[in-house]
């Protein structure tokens, strides 16, 4: 590994946690600085659990800060040795962006600007940052390719992620910073986000509560298991590109009703389903074209939806005593 001092934003988040843990498990001479504001968008108990696991590593340094606060960011990091930034921190969630749009501008716009500007001022040569499949909006052409138009987002969250890509190009063009954007497709797995459908489904099924099934179940998602996403991020870190955007998905869309059937099977309990109309800001289908990622990164997802959900459900059952209280 070329980089020895990596800053991971959102390190107590779902993807940030798994990436940080993988890096420290596999590279003894590598140090991770993790930053996170540990906000309460979802129950912070889960973020604390992830963070406590990471704090057990000697080569992990955690700093609680809000990277949308420029002065706080600089004050805490100006003296740290950093040679790569993996920017995963963000205000997540499509539906929540309809309720609290200001949170997205603050974190995803101002926060990302601050991270990019920090890289410029402190001579950090490369930033790998999280984008999202939501930038494809309501595009009807499938699968979604990096060359497709992405100028018609249908949620504020999506618009902020597209804005991040545009800012990244500016910082590459003006200052020569290497910028690699990764469009994640519905990431799932252990220690995932409680606001995500699969997590809510598992929790409510075990509690005997109804699960909400949008668009009457007529939806498909390109669910991507966390270990495949971490593999894609690692490849983006190691490969030497000046500016690129890549899809990181599974390229095998799963029908929502089959997805629910699998969770029922692995939890050994039937769901009580409440069928609802399509939600504002949602899309019918996501489907990643991985030809570019495979060609340039060598990225090939390995975990099937059956295997991934089995792992998640087993983990959930083993930890249900505290997970059901979230």
UniProtKB/Swiss-Prot annotation:
SUPFAM superfamilies: NAD(P)-binding Rossmann-fold domains (SSF51735). The active site is at residue 157. This is Uncharacterized protein MJ1055. Belongs to the NAD(P)-dependent epimerase/dehydratase family. dTDP-glucose dehydratase subfamily. Gene3D superfamilies: NAD(P)-binding Rossmann-like Domain (3.40.50.720), UDP-galactose 4-epimerase, domain 1 (3.90.25.10). GO terms for molecular function: lyase activity. Substrate binds at residue 132. It comes from Methanocaldococcus jannaschii (strain ATCC 43067 / DSM 2661 / JAL-1 / JCM 10045 / NBRC 100440). InterPro entries: Epimerase_deHydtase, NAD(P)-bd_dom_sf. Transmembrane segments: none annotated. Keywords: Lyase, NAD.
């Amino acid at each position: 590994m070329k980089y020895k001092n990596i800053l991971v934003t959102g390190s107590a988040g779902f993807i940030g946690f798994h990436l940080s843990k993988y890096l420290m498990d596999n590279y003894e001479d590598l140090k991770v600085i993790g930053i996170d504001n540990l906000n309460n968008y979802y129950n912070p108990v889960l973020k604390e659990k992830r963070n406590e696991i990471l704090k057990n590593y000697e080569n992990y340094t955690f700093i609680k800060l809000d990277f949308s606060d420029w002065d706080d960011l600089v004050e805490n990091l100006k003296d740290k040795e950093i040679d790569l930034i993996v920017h995963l921190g963000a205000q997540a969630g499509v539906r929540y962006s309809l309720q609290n749009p200001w949170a997205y501008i603050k974190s995803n716009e101002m926060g990302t600007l601050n991270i990019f500007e920090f890289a410029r001022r402190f001579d950090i040569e490369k930033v790998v940052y999280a984008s999202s499949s939501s930038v494809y909006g309501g595009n009807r052409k499938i699968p979604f390719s990096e060359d497709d138009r992405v100028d018609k987002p249908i949620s504020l969250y999506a618009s902020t992620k597209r804005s991040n890509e545009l800012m990244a190009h500016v910082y590459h063009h003006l200052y020569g910073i290497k910028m690699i954007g990764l469009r994640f497709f519905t990431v799932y797995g252990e220690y995932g986000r409680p606001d995500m459908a699969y997590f809510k489904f598992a929790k409510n099924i075990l509690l005997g509560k109804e699960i909400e099934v949008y668009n009457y179940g007529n939806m498909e998602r390109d669910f991507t298991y966390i270990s495949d996403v971490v593999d894609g991020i690692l490849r983006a870190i190691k490969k030497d590109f000046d500016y690129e955007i890549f899809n990181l998905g599974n390229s095998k869309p799963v029908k929502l009703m089959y997805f629910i059937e699998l969770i029922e099977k692995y939890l050994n309990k039937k769901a009580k389903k409440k069928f609802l109309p399509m939600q504002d800001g949602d899309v019918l289908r996501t489907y990643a074209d991985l030809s570019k990622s495979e060609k340039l990164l060598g990225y090939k997802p390995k975990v099937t939806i059956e295997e991934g959900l089995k792992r998640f459900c087993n983990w959930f059952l083993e930890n249900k005593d505290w997970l059901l209280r979230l």
